[in-house]
């Protein structure tokens, strides 16, 4: 059961069947359950949310969540990104905080999510509309992998930029640099999510295919919260095999 909070918090899991890098990945078997079913179950089991929903335009995914006894909303429109999809779903909901949980993240860490949500209850929280997670990267292959979105932040932990390219660029190879991976889980105030939904995509978001860049392009702030927990997202068939081994 979710602990009492002054905020009504819902988790929304945008689920698109035709993923460009790994089509149909959310319906792939992950040791007896589909990827999307495991992600939904993991979100519910954190007990951090008043409600958890999958939001999809796919009949296959819709039926899968219904058959699993979960809550699912059918998208009415085509959307460029997951945050747009969930904004449509929550537009008429009575909710304060909306957490965007990626459908291909079946290993959700409760403590990391709790840290994310705690930001909205701390002093000065009224100035924060959107928070997200970052985790250090050490392996050079992970740093250069374009499927791992990198983020750089200022001294106050607000995001400066996100990229699939390793940032910052180390012109001075002796410089002490820590690279951070962006974990694609966002916690929005509902008002900020609806603002995001109404803002047209600009060229940097379109080039990188990273939805949170839109927020930066319009001069808004994203508070980043560091976690040591490594995200296990499923972007490729190889990732799926790694996930299967983790569960076996």
UniProtKB/Swiss-Prot annotation:
- EC numbers for this chain: 2.7.7.38
Which superkingdom heads the taxonomic lineage of this protein's source?
Bacteria
Which subcellular locations apply to this protein? Cytoplasm
One GO biological process term is:
lipopolysaccharide biosynthetic process
Which reaction equation describes what this protein catalyses?
A: 3-deoxy-alpha-D-manno-oct-2-ulosonate + CTP = CMP-3-deoxy-beta-D-manno-octulosonate + diphosphate
Q: Which GO terms describe its cellular component?
A: cytosol
Q: What pathway does this protein act in?
A: Nucleotide-sugar biosynthesis; CMP-3-deoxy-D-manno-octulosonate biosynthesis; CMP-3-deoxy-D-manno-octulosonate from 3-deoxy-D-manno-octulosonate and CTP: step 1/1; Bacterial outer membrane biogenesis; lipopolysaccharide biosynthesis
Task: Write the record's keywords in alphabetical order, separated by commas.
Answer: Cytoplasm, Lipopolysaccharide biosynthesis, Nucleotidyltransferase, Transferase
Per its record, what are the GO molecular function terms? 3-deoxy-manno-octulosonate cytidylyltransferase activity
Principal cellular location given in the protein's record: cytoplasm
Q: What does this protein do?
A: Activates KDO (a required 8-carbon sugar) for incorporation into bacterial lipopolysaccharide in Gram-negative bacteria.
Record-stated family = Belongs to the KdsB family.
Q: Quote the protein name from its UniProt record.
A: 3-deoxy-manno-octulosonate cytidylyltransferase
Q: Which organism is it from?
A: Christiangramia forsetii (strain DSM 17595 / CGMCC 1.15422 / KT0803) (Gramella forsetii)
Gene that encodes the chain: kdsB
């Amino acid at each position: 059961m979710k602990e009492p909070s002054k905020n009504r918090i819902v988790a929304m899991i945008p689920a698109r069947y035709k993923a460009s890098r790994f089509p149909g990945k959310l319906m792939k078997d992950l040791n007896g359950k589909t990827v999307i079913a495991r992600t939904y179950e993991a979100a519910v089991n954190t007990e951090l949310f008043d409600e958890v929903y999958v939001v999809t335009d796919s009949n296959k995914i819709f039926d899968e969540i219904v058959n699993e006894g979960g809550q699912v909303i059918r998208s009415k429109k085509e959307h460029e990104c997951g945050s747009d999809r969930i904004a449509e779903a929550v537009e008429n909901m009575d909710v304060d905080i909306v957490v965007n949980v990626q459908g291909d993240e079946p290993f959700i860490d409760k403590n990391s999510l709790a840290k994310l949500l705690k930001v909205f209850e701390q002093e000065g929280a009224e100035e924060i509309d959107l928070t997200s997670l970052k985790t250090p990267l050490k392996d050079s292959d992970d740093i250069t992998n374009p499927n791992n979105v990198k983020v750089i932040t200022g001294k106050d932990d607000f995001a400066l930029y996100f990229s699939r390219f390793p940032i910052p660029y180390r012109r001075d190879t002796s410089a002490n640099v820590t690279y951070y991976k962006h974990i694609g889980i966002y916690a929005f105030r509902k008002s900020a999510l609806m603002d995001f939904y109404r803002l047209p995509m600009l060229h940097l978001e379109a080039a990188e295919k990273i939805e949170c860049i839109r927020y930066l392009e319009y001069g808004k702030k994203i508070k980043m919260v560091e976690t040591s927990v490594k995200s296990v997202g499923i972007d490729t068939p190889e990732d799926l095999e790694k996930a299967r081994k983790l569960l076996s």
